[in-house]
């Protein structure tokens, strides 16, 4: 076993809630390491929606998923968190009161006073559509998320699906793509009504295509798509130009090893009490989309609130002999010094 990395708090998940938890903990002189299965920070915001606008962050009228991630990273710079990316936590073992030993699939071992699970919905992967040979084009012509809009500029783009992601990217990519074709198995969409109205208006004006049916075959060479075959609900078969494809068939969410850590679960979520969002195991907290409690709303701003209250309770485990005096960043010179603004 490798030598243990010691830290006050280990945060599992480097999405927005995990990142903001670093800030709240840092204000209380609590050091944190973060582990994430993804190869970059930002969680689903950066992985699936990096250029999609977010409108419900308080005081920020609009920010993209990547923009929010970048701003959070800037905000936590004063606390110098350490990131361990591309790793999954495989085991959490209680070794003290408080105290935990955490092991990753890369063989790293951590010892900490507090564990914070901020793993979103757990590990996730997009559902692959049942199209023969689609794997050969994944990562070059077939993408399950939009990370850089510019790569779709001037391309014939086929978007498959009928939910919010499919409609949102149809509307967002329409201005820059050569041509957008939206494919859905029925003429009934699960997306926001306003988005559906906008899409139908574009179709009616001849600015994009809508096909009711399914993609049955792909054509291309060396990973580069050139065409897609569509079989309509009337059994008519049509081949259309396709240089890029975005299938949005939803995500398969897996809680993964969390289910084996001895924490009470409820429908693949972690129940918590609401004064500090502590789990059934003292010293292990769960914040963000992975937790559940009466009245839970899955919003980023709610996860931020949960992180703030979690930090107050975590302080008791990290500094059991030290009384916590609540301070405001607007008036506390000591907090401002930590933030480098005084």
Curated annotation (Swiss-Prot):
Q: What is its EC number?
A: 1.18.1.2
Superkingdom of this entry's organism? Bacteria
| Residues that coordinate or bind FAD | 17, 36, 44, 49, 89, 124, 289, 330
Q: If you read the UniProt record, what top EC class would you report for this enzyme, in one word? A: oxidoreductase
Q: Which cofactor does it need?
A: FAD
Q: Which UniProt keywords apply?
A: FAD, Flavoprotein, NADP, Oxidoreductase
Molecular function per GO: ferredoxin-NADP+ reductase activity; flavin adenine dinucleotide binding; NADP binding
Catalysed reactions, as listed in the record: 2 reduced [2Fe-2S]-[ferredoxin] + NADP(+) + H(+) = 2 oxidized [2Fe-2S]-[ferredoxin] + NADPH
SUPFAM superfamilies per UniProt: FAD/NAD(P)-binding domain (SSF51905)
Manner of cofactor binding, per the entry note: Binds 1 FAD per subunit.
Q: Which family does it belong to?
A: Belongs to the ferredoxin--NADP reductase type 2 family.
- Quaternary structure and partners: Homodimer.
Instruction: Report what the protein is called.
Output: Ferredoxin--NADP reductase
């Amino acid at each position: 076993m490798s030598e243990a990395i010691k830290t006050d708090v280990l945060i599992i998940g480097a999405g927005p809630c995990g990142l903001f938890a670093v800030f709240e903990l840092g204000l209380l002189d609590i050091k944190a390491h973060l582990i994430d299965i993804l190869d970059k920070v930002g969680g689903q915001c950066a992985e699936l929606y990096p250029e999609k606008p977010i409108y419900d962050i308080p005081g920020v009228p609009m920010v993209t998923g990547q923009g929010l991630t970048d701003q959070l990273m800037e905000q936590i710079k004063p606390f110098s968190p350490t990131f361990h990316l591309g790793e999954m936590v495989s085991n959490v073992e209680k070794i003290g009161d408080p105290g935990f030993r955490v092991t990753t699939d890369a063989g790293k071992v951590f010892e900490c006073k507090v564990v914070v699970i901020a793993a979103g919905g757990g590990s996730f992967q997009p559902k692959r559509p049942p199209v023969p040979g689609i794997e050969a084009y994944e990562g070059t012509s077939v993408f399950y998320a939009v990370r850089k809009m510019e790569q779709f500029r001037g391309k014939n783009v086929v978007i498959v699906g009928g939910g919010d992601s499919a409609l949102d990217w149809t509307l967002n990519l329409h201005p820059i793509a050569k041509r957008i074709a939206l494919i859905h198995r029925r003429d009934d969409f699960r997306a926001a009504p306003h988005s559906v109205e906008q899409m139908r208006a574009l179709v009616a004006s001849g600015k994009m295509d809508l096909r009711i049916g399914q993609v049955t075959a792909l054509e291309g060479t060396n990973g580069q798509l050139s065409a897609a075959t569509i079989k309509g609900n009337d059994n008519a078969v049509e081949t259309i130009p396709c240089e890029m494809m975005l299938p949005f068939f939803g995500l398969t969410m897996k809680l993964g090893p969390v289910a084996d850590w001895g924490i009470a679960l409820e429908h693949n979520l972690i129940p918590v009490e609401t004064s500090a969002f502590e789990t059934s195991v003292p010293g292990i907290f769960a914040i963000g989309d992975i937790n559940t409690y009466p009245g839970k709303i899955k919003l980023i701003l709610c996860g931020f609130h949960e992180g703030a209250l979690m930090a107050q309770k975590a302080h008791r485990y990290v500094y059991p002999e030290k009384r916590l005096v609540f301070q405001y960043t607007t008036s506390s010179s000591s907090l401002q010094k930590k933030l480098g603004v005084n």
